From Swiss-Prot:
Residues 61-218 form the CP-type G domain. This is Small ribosomal subunit biogenesis GTPase RsgA. Pfam families: RsgA_GTPase (PF03193), RsgA_N (PF16745). GO terms for cellular component: cytoplasm. It comes from the Bacteria. GO terms for molecular function: GTP binding; GTPase activity; metal ion binding; rRNA binding. Zn(2+) binds at C242, C247, H249, C255. It comes from Clostridium kluyveri (strain ATCC 8527 / DSM 555 / NBRC 12016 / NCIMB 10680 / K1). Belongs to the TRAFAC class YlqF/YawG GTPase family. RsgA subfamily. GTP binds at N110, K111, L112, D113, G161, P162, S163, G164, V165, G166, K167, S168, T169. Binds 1 zinc ion per subunit. One of several proteins that assist in the late maturation steps of the functional core of the 30S ribosomal subunit. Helps release RbfA from mature subunits. May play a role in the assembly of ribosomal proteins into the subunit. Circularly permuted GTPase that catalyzes slow GTP hydrolysis, GTPase activity is stimulated by the 30S ribosomal subunit. Its EC number is 3.6.1.-. It is found in: Cytoplasm.
Amino acid sequence: MRGTIMKGIGGFYYVNTDRGIIECRARGKFRYNGLFPMVGDKVEIKLERDQGIIDEICPRISQLKRPAVANVTQALVVFAFNHPEINEDLLNKFLISCEFNNLKPIVCFNKLDLADKEKKLDVIDMIRNTGYEVIFLKAKEGYGIDKVREKLKDNITVLCGPSGVGKSTILNAIYGKELMETGQISHKLNRGKHTTRHSEIIELEDGFMVDTPGFSSLDIGHITKDKLQYCFPEFIEFIGICKFTGCVHHKEPDCAVKSALYDDKINKRRYDFYVKTLNEISSKKKY
């Protein structure tokens, strides 16, 4: 029997099949082989003593490490302009993760009414200079929600971003009812409580949405130095025309990417983040 994992909690996986949702466990062979079922996986299951058993995980068309989801077609990367304060490094890490996994990211800035004007323009310029689509939201008031709905049609969309930015509020506005519990910002840490504690596929009218827990940090250390450059779409047209083969666009002379930076074809803040990430990858490799 084939189905799709809709959510996973405490070692149990809830698989949507022709017979409805079946609670399943995974066979031990997956753990032995270092393979773990993910929300979004297409799986073959068997019934043994009234217990569903995941017997096979079908090949994935896409996969995110964190949040751990499979077979999604695009990502809504949600950040708030304030409460919590926007973390540009974390935003860029989410975008890198999407690019590395061949997912189309759409950047949603929520809480537009709380934005500092100068900061808003800087962040918008940084993202738009890369060619990413940007949607502005005031989710509590419903502003911008129709634009999000348009993007969901015929897609399996992962909703991701840090805690407290309003992902559950956005999902409730899209769905039209209080589907997910919404949390308040933790005053002690000025970060959002992790209201969503597990990833789950939500079926919508024209598509599917994967709601995921919020994160205050994101590790992209699995991306190698030579692959990192391809996670910056604004670099692509300049890669391969540098003087030196294997140029990583940092200290090498006659670098086409750095020339584009000097000509204002690449955003300096994005390039600075690239160099910072490149150095972090190099430092990890030494140990």
